[in-house]
């Protein structure tokens, strides 16, 4: 299955994202702690924790830092009051946006999320307003690789789909609970992924033009700058031509 490269949609934001690495680590640690607290410290029997571990390793977090976070969660700590909250809304150009948060103060979090939507011409919706457009999946990514080899190994390991992109990148889609097992099987076959994460995959895309694309990117940046926001999912599609103008 061929598709438009997601790397083209994100490469122009790489520098800004690299600058946020410290904040990304903080958010990953918070997810590791929460996942371990809720489901135990063994990634093999805790899919949420395994997904967090895979994300931590994909972002080059050390095993020592990772293990300390898990130990904090198992032992109970100051993050015990954290809860997962999902906000839904519409961004620039009618994009569907889902915002996953970990928060100990709902009032603070919703105020920050609503502010980001309002400042960029979007609006915060009600529960269920856009979530029906997304499916929770595991995504195992290869920047380059042999399509036939990866596809054969992935499907043999239980993957649901394999998507190839114009620039040679390949994504393997799995049931989110099975992502860790599929990644292990791929590595056992000599195929080391560049990234693995649980994501919300949209069923439809909204094409962004030169006017709406910068507004969408600003919304994403504002949301990601919120300490309580863990992940931002959207169905905006930015073409190579539009990305080149940003």
UniProtKB/Swiss-Prot annotation:
Q: Which GO terms describe its cellular component?
A: cytosol
Q: Which GO terms describe its biological process?
A: regulation of DNA-templated transcription
Q: Where does this protein have coiled-coil stretches?
A: none
Top-rank taxon, per record: Bacteria
State the Gene Ontology terms under molecular function.
Answer: DNA binding
List keywords of the entry alphabetically.
Cytoplasm, DNA-binding, Transcription, Transcription regulation
- Which cellular compartments is it found in? Cytoplasm
Name the SUPFAM superfamilies for this protein.
YebC-like
The protein's matches in InterPro entries, at most eight in alphabetical order, are given as: Integrase-like_N, TACO1_YebC-like_2nd/3rd_dom, TACO1_YebC_N, Transcrip_reg_TACO1-like, Transcrip_reg_TACO1-like_dom3, YebC-like
Q: Where is this protein primarily located?
A: cytoplasm
- Pfam families the UniProt entry points to: TACO1_YebC_N, Transcrip_reg
Annotated NCBIfam families: PRK00110.1, PRK12378.1, YebC/PmpR family DNA-binding transcriptional regulator
Stated family: Belongs to the TACO1 family.
Q: What is this protein called?
A: Probable transcriptional regulatory protein KPN78578_23430
The organism is Klebsiella pneumoniae subsp. pneumoniae (strain ATCC 700721 / MGH 78578)
Lineage from the top down? Bacteria, Pseudomonadati, Pseudomonadota, Gammaproteobacteria, Enterobacterales
